[in-house]
Curated annotation (Swiss-Prot):
InterPro entries: Ribosomal_bL32, Ribosomal_bL32_bact, Ribosomal_zn-bd. The lineage of its organism: Bacteria, Bacillati, Bacillota, Bacilli, Lactobacillales. It comes from Streptococcus gordonii (strain Challis / ATCC 35105 / BCRC 15272 / CH1 / DL1 / V288). This is Large ribosomal subunit protein bL32. NCBIfam families: rpmF_bact. The keyword Manganese does not apply. The keyword Nucleotide-binding does not apply. Keywords: Ribonucleoprotein, Ribosomal protein. It comes from the Bacteria. GO terms for biological process: translation. GO terms for molecular function: structural constituent of ribosome. Belongs to the bacterial ribosomal protein bL32 family. GO terms for cellular component: large ribosomal subunit. SUPFAM superfamilies: Zn-binding ribosomal proteins.
Length: 60
């Protein structure tokens, strides 16, 4: 079984981890409802591309 010859330093470890980034989700403004929603998804009120395609979820 292979074993590392030397311990990985903090600098080496952190340089490798610089590529693990979180990106912000793309958000668009829906003119029909006046709310912001994520792209290519149905809004909470049931609209997609300005058309009503689903019933809105009932608030509990």
């Amino acid at each position: 079984m292979a074993v590392p010859a030397r311990r990985t330093s903090k600098a080496k470890k952190n340089k490798r981890r610089t590529h693990y980034k979180v990106t912000a989700p793309s958000v668009t403004f829906d003119e029909t409802t006046g709310d912001y929603s994520r792209s290519h998804r149905v809004s909470l009120k049931g609209y997609y591309k300005g058309r009503k395609i689903a019933k809105a979820a009932a608030a509990e």
